[in-house]
Structures are given as structure tokens and as C-alpha cells.
Curated annotation (Swiss-Prot):
Name used for this protein in its record: UvrABC system protein C
InterPro entries, per database record: GIY-YIG_endonuc (IPR000305), GIY-YIG_endonuc_sf (IPR035901), GIY-YIG_UvrC_Cho (IPR047296), RuvA_2-like (IPR010994), UVR_dom (IPR001943), UVR_dom_sf (IPR036876), UvrABC_protein_C (IPR050066), UvrC (IPR004791)
Acyltransferase listed as a keyword: no
SMART domains, A to Z: GIYc
Length: 590
């Protein structure tokens, strides 16, 4: 911990508020809230933590805090700060999942539409529905039952819906407000759970039509009843009061939290939302933050009632959301809460089981790879790849896999310094020499296996440096590719021989992941260097633009393409003197 952090920790107040953790670049990486700032912020730097929290702590170089007058104010501020900074460790709602609704528009001649965007307008929203297909099926049923206008713009003549009996044709006929109001009330009653009453009314009309020998009309009514049954009675009833409510419950273990949300609409459990994310503060406070973000960030429709566990501050949620919040002690509502909690525990258990299986597969693949190469299990693998285009901007990259998983913290990039032109052998010698000279000098861990993404020449070049220059005894293998640039074989030994691996084995898949990753890392670095080089060359020989200003322009525009799209004024605003800006602008336009 640096001196500045220690001094700031000593000055933390005994008050509620929010804290913003920052990395070396002063980027906000995590936002949290606390009832007592001093206790919460200090807890990150004392005691032991799980792996995920420890990873966060290792990146913290600075922090700031904002004192609030209450816990509720801290919760609201935390939500706003997360929305503003989008910190990488506040990941609970990154996917922004939204659900579809059926909207009854507030127009002279109302329409029914399916939408995911709930606005504060005068329209009536019904939902959410589990998916867009369910919403469209329900709308299609309502279109059959109630002849509302379908067209977004009123046409000059009647459309097909009028001839099908699904529209009253307000485009050419004078439809009274009373008629529209009756249709709106009927649809509202239907969507609020009164479809059984509608079905009963239709059955009475069907029997009446049959008695009057109006068989076509009776058949039409029978079909409408069948559509209601097939569309609306797929869900099992869970409540009898038909109140729209959301049920929130959570479980946490091993540094992870799972929140389950049950959507109850018109007495039915129509859908659930599952969110899983790392836990960096107290579970009940993280849960409060989640609920606040759930409705503000994801544009979810606020129901009439919300159910939460009794461990949560009920009044704070009520003040935040301005809706009814209940903590049931018994009965059907309590059973719903317990069911949501049970599902959260199951989801966490499944996640940990999958992690364990993945680790077993990864470790098993590493062990099998060692057996295939006749070496000790290569727990630590370091892989190298070169990248250049006809010898220009040559670079190399090294990646690290530990127990079959990428360890990106130890990835390294290299600009080739001693080689000119397209010399992959010389480049490999330089990079391997630089890497392991430093490893020996700084007493860093040596790999159990070195993998070279290249042909025999590069493998032998790396071996020569490792064995003859540095006197190390590390197994070196090479990845051979087929004509489609896919992993085909593994080369090892002196002289090099093919180590045969089953194409569908876990160890072969591990090699593919290593080859793909080191190639991706090297290529992305080369593109970055090439882009900077192109940028620099455009700026060469322009009076008034030196190295410092070149770096400033690169940071401002990012690429030559964006700089070419810029106006003269844009270039001046980037801090370039008028004369130099004119010269640069003229050069870019050629």
C-alpha cells in the first residue's frame, strides 16, 4: 500500500457515503456505498479476501469518497455514479436485459403495439412478457377480439384488417369516443386478468347464436374461445389476487452473489431473471444496489408490489422506488420468496460445479499433454509468436497459461530491436533471450514448457538460446499448422518429431487455445504499432509538429482515418497552431 493511501485511510469519516476506487490511470474501477465509510473502505486493505476481491484490491492505487446525509442518499448516489463511470468491477447488470410489453397507446384512435421501451407517457403498459413471441401471440389474440386501429398512420382507404373484422376503419368512418373507450376498457380488463370473464361472455353469445341458428357466428365465437384458451391458459396460477408483483431473493457463497427475480403478472409466474456477479461488499447492501439498478438501468416496468426478504431495509426501497414493498412472514407470498431463494442457491451451486468441472478438465488436459510429450506436468506454459508484414514493424508476443488457463497479468509484448527485415529466426532469438535473461536476473518463475508458434527454424532458434546461451533445461515444443492455418501437430525433441495427439482430446483443444491466443495477442500488438507508425509518418516534415505534439494528436484522434475526417477547426481545437494545422489539413486532403 502506498503512502498516500495510508494517509487517506486515516482521514476517513464515521459517516455514510459512497467511495470510488481508482487504478493507476485514475480510472474509476469500482463504486460502493457504506453506512460507515471508515469501516468499509479500510476493510479492503485489511484481513484476507477471496480471489475476486483480492484482484480488485491489487488494482487500487487511489480512492475518493463522498459523504451523504443518509443511507438512502448513499444508495441513490451510488446508482448515479455507477451509471456515470460504468466501472469494470460493478458488473451486476452489464447485459441490460429488457423484456417486451404490450402497450395500449393514448391516441384519438388507440393502437396495440409490442415494445421493450417503457416510457412515462399516457399509454398503458401490460407485462413484462417472457419473450417477444409470447407478447405477439397475446396481441394477435386481442386483434381478433377487439377491432382497434392497426395502422400507425391513417391511410386514405380501408385496409385488409377492416375486411377481416379486426378494425373499425377510423380512416374513413367516424368512430365515436364512446366506442373507443369501451374497446380500451375491455382490453384493459382482459390484460389485467379478466380473460375468464371474457371467455364466459363469449360462450354465452355462442350458445345464443346456436339457438338462433346463426351457425357461422357460433363457429366464429367458438374459434375465439379456443384462441383464448390456447394463448392465455398456458401458465399455472400462482396467486389469486391478480396483483402485478416482482419477487426478489438472493443467495451468496465463495465471493459470488446470485439474485433471482420472479415476475408475477395477473397472478401468474410468467418469467424470471437470474443475475450472477462477484460480491465486493455486504450482501444486503449489494442487494439494495441491485434492486435500485434493476429498475433504473434496465428500464423495467415498476409493478404495484415488490416482495423482498426480511433481512433488507424495506423502508429504503419504498422511498427509493415509491412503490409498495412487503416482507411476507407466511402464506403464498412467503412461499414465492422461499422458492426464489431456493432457485438462487441452486444457480450458485451449479456455477461452482461448472467451475470445478472446467478446472478438472483444464488440469487433466495439462497432465495429458505432459504425458504425450514425456515431460513433467507443464503447470506453467509460456508461448511465443512473431508478427510483421514483409519485415516492417516486427514485434513479438508472449502469453502465459497456468494449469490450462490464460494468466493475462503476465502477458508481454516486445518490439524487435536488433533485427532488420523479415528475419523470424533472428526475432525469435532476440525475444527468447530478452525474456529469460530477465527471468534469471529477477529470479522469476521458469516455465515447465515453452511453446513456439512457428516452424522448425524458429523452434531451433529458441532452443539454441535456451540451452547454449543461457544454459537452461526447459522443454521446447512447436506448433505446426495446416494449409488453413489451423493447429495440426506438435513438434518436440532434438531432432524435432511429431508428438501425436488425438484431434478431439482435451490436450489438443488446449494447444489450439494457446495458439489462437498467442496469435491474437501478437497480431493485435502489431496492428497497434503499425497504426501508430502510419500516424507518425503522416505528421512527419510538418513544421510545428514535433514528437510531443504527435503523441497528443494520436491520443486525440486515435487513427489516421479519424484525423482525415476532421475539419481544420477540429485540428486546431486539438491544440495545433493555426499555421501547422493548415499544413496538416492540406496534407491529409491529398
Amino acid at each position: 500500500m502506498n503512502k498516500q493511501l495510508k494517509e487517506k485511510l486515516a482521514l476517513l469519516p464515521d459517516q455514510p457515503g459512497c467511495y470510488l476506487m481508482k487504478d493507476r490511470q485514475q480510472t474509476v474501477i469500482y463504486v460502493g456505498k457504506a453506512k460507515v465509510l471508515k469501516n468499509r473502505v479500510r476493510s479492503y486493505f485489511t484481513g484476507s479476501h477471496d480471489a475476486k476481491t483480492q484482484r480488485l484490491v491489487t488494482e487500487i492505487e487511489d480512492f475518493e469518497y463522498i459523504v451523504t446525509s443518509s443511507n438512502l442518499e448513499a444508495l441513490i448516489l451510488e446508482m448515479n455514479l455507477i451509471k456515470k463511470h460504468d466501472p469494470k468491477y460493478n458488473v451486476m447488470l452489464k447485459d441490460d436485459k429488457t423484456y417486451p410489453f404490450i402497450k395500449l397507446t393514448h391516441e384519438r384512435h388507440p393502437r396495440l403495439i409490442v415494445t421493450r421501451n417503457v416510457k412515462k407517457d399516457k399509454g398503458r403498459y401490460f407485462g413484462p412478457y417472457p419473450n417477444v413471441q409470447a407478447a405477439r401471440e397475446t396481441k394477435k389474440l386481442l386483434d381478433r377480439l377487439y377491432p382497434l386501429r392497426k395502422c400507425s398512420k391513417l391511410p386514405d382507404r380501408v385496409c385488409l384488417y377492416y375486411h377481416l373484422g379486426q378494425c373499425l376503419a377510423p380512416c374513413v368512418k367516424d368512430i365515436s369516443e364512446e366506442t373507443n373507450r369501451e374497446l380500451v376498457e375491455s382490453i384493459t380488463r382482459f390484460l389485467r386478468g379478466g380473460y375468464n370473464e371474457v371467455k364466459k361472455e363469449l360462450e354465452e353469445k355462442m350458445h345464443e347464436a346456436a339457438e338462433n341458428l346463426e351457425f357461422e357466428r357460433a363457429k366464429e365465437l367458438r374459434d375465439q374461445i379456443a384462441h383464448i384458451e390456447s394463448t392465455m391458459e398456458k401458465q399455472k396460477m400462482t396467486m389469486n389476487d391478480l396483483v402485478d408483483r416482482d419477487v426478489f431473493a438472493y443467495a451468496y457463497d465463495k465471493g459470488w452473489m446470485c439474485v433471482q427475480v420472479f415476475f408475477i403478472r395477473q397472478g401468474k409466474l410468467i418469467e424470471r431473471d437470474v443475475s450472477m456477479f462477484p460480491l465486493y461488499q455486504e450482501a444486503d447492501e449489494e442487494f439494495l444496489t441491485f434492486i435500485g439498478q434493476f429498475y433504473s438501468k434496465n428500464n423495467h416496468f415498476l409493478p404495484k408490489e415488490i416482495l423482498v426478504p426480511d433481512s433488507i431495509d424495506q423502508s429504503m426501497i419504498e422511498q427509493l422506488l415509491e412503490t409498495n414493498v412487503h416482507q411476507p412472514k407466511k402464506g403464498p407470498k412467503k412461499e414465492l420468496l422461499m422458492l426464489a431463494h431456493k432457485n438462487a442457491k441452486i444457480a450458485l451451486k451449479e456455477k461452482f460445479s461448472l467451475i470445478e468441472r472446467d478446472e478438472e478438465r483444464s488440469i487433466g488436459a495439462v497432465q495429458k499433454l505432459g504425458e504425450a510429450l514425456n515431460i513433467y506436468t507443464p503447470h506453467r506454459i509460456e508461448a511465443f509468436d512473431n508478427s510483421n508484414i514483409q519485415g516492417t514493424n516486427p514485434v513479438s508476443a508472449m502469453i502465459v497459461f497456468i494449469d490450462g488457463k490464460p494468466y493475462k497479468k503476465e502477458y508481454r509484448k516486445y518490439k524487435i530491436k536488433t533485427v532488420t527485415g523479415p528475419d523470424d529466426y533472428g526475432s525469435m532469438r532476440e525475444v527468447v533471450r530478452r525474456r529469460y535473461t530477465r527471468v534469471l536476473r529477477e529470479n522469476l518463475p521458469l516455465p515447465d514448457l515453452i511453446i513456439i508458434d512457428g516452424g522448425k527454424g524458429q523452434i531451433n532458434a529458441a532452443r539454441d538460446v535456451i540451452e547454449n546461451e543461457l544454459g537452461l533445461d526447459i522443454p521446447i515444443a512447436g506448433l505446426a499448422k495446416d494449409e488453413k492455418h489451423r493447429t495440426s501437430n506438435l513438434l518436440i525433441g532434438d531432432p524435432l518429431e511429431v508428438a501425436y495427439l488425438e484431434r478431439n482430446s482435451q490436450e489438443f483443444y488446449l494447444l489450439q487455445r494457446i495458439q489462437d491466443e498467442v496469435h491474437r495477442f501478437a497480431i493485435s500488438f502489431h496492428r497497434q504499432i503499425r497504426g501508430k507508425s502510419a500516424f507518425q509518418s503522416v505528421l512527419d516534415d510538418i513544421p510545428g509538429i514535433g514528437e510531443k505534439r504527435k503523441k497528443m494528436l494520436l491520443k486525440h484522434f486515435g487513427s489516421v482515418k479519424k484525423m482525415k475526417e476532421a475539419s481544420l477547426e477540429d485540428i486546431k481545437k486539438a491544440g495545433v497552431p493555426a499555421a501547422a494545422a493548415q499544413l496538416l489539413y492540406d496534407k491529409l486532403q491529398k
